[in-house]
């Protein structure tokens, strides 16, 4: 567990922003969902392993918290051993992600079995600590309008094709990220400008304003980094 936390920490340092990974059974609609959420045009095909490499797009929450949305290879039951190494890089995206979005095919009669497979694969990979957001996709194709969402309690009901429910998913992602990342305003007098070089690399600067006494710097960064800075330099570096 500690090793996985360290890997995620290094991944955040490399990307500078949190990572949200779309995972799910093959053909659940992950690539279509990524396209709908980001306005991109990732290749979409109704076949096994249409997505072999991890594809990522940078977007923001309504609160201006940036994150990488990553599309991963679709899982299947009894993945052939010979293919595991080929998929290792994209599977590792799930392990290193800060939040997992599990995309389920609401139009499939085997949704429960497919969901169980995804949960088992995530467990096998060691991706067990991250918060998870359950999604039931293809609500425009449900044969049982009321039944499908009930198979996975608390799941977001949406259609990656039509866009229905996308706003709720964005809100759920933002809620999870706010537990880890948030905008913080630092108040730095002229004699503490040396801290700017330490703060900037930790997150994304969304505003900086010079005053008569120094600089007010607003950065989206991990709560853990904020707490570490406050512990080292005192609460006076925070506005308010």
Briefly describe each language-model feature range.
Residues 53, 88-91, 116-119, 167-170:
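Generic alpha-helical structural signal
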Residues 46, 112, 163:
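Electropositive phosphate-/nucleotide-binding environments in soluble metabolic enzymes
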Residues 81-85, 113-116, 168, 197:
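Generic recognition of short, well-ordered alpha-helical segments
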Residues 73-87, 118, 132, 154-155, ...:
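A beta-strand-loop signature enriched in Asp, Gly, Thr, and Trp
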Residues 1-39, 109, 120-240:
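C-terminal-of-GTPase-core extension/linker across diverse P-loop GTPases
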Residues 91, 95-98, 106-127:
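A glycine- and small/hydrophobic-rich beta-loop-beta segment
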Residues 1-100, 104:
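Conserved G1/Walker A P-loop phosphate-binding module
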Residues 78-81, 109-112, 144:
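Conserved D-loop-proximal element of ABC-family nucleotide-binding domains
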């Amino acid at each position: 567990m500690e090793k996985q936390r360290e890997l995620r920490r290094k991944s955040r340092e490399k990307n500078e922003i949190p990572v949200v990974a779309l995972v799910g059974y093959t053909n659940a609609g992950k690539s279509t969902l990524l396209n709908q959420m980001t306005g991109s045009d990732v290749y979409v095909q109704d076949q096994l392993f249409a997505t072999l490499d991890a594809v990522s797009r940078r977007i923001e929450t309504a609160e201006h918290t940036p994150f990488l949305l990553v599309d991963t290879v679709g899982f299947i039951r009894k993945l052939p051993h010979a293919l595991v190494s080929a998929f290792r890089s994209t599977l590792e995206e799930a392990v290193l992600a800060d939040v997992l979005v599990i995309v389920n095919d609401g139009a499939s009669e085997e949704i429960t079995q497919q969901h169980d497979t995804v949960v088992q694969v995530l467990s096998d990979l060691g991706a067990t600590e991250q918060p998870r957001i359950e999604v039931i996709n293809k609500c425009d194709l449900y044969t049982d309008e009321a039944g499908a969402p009930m198979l996975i309690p608390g799941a977001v009901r949406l259609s990656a094709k039509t866009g229905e429910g996308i706003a709720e998913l964005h809100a759920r992602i933002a809620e999870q990220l706010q537990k880890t990342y948030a905008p913080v305003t630092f108040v730095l007098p002229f004699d503490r400008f040396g801290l700017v070089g330490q703060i900037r690399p930790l997150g994304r600067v969304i505003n900086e304003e010079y005053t008569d006494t120094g600089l007010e710097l607003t950065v989206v960064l991990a709560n853990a980094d904020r707490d570490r800075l406050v512990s080292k330099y005192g609460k006076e570096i925070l506005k308010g």
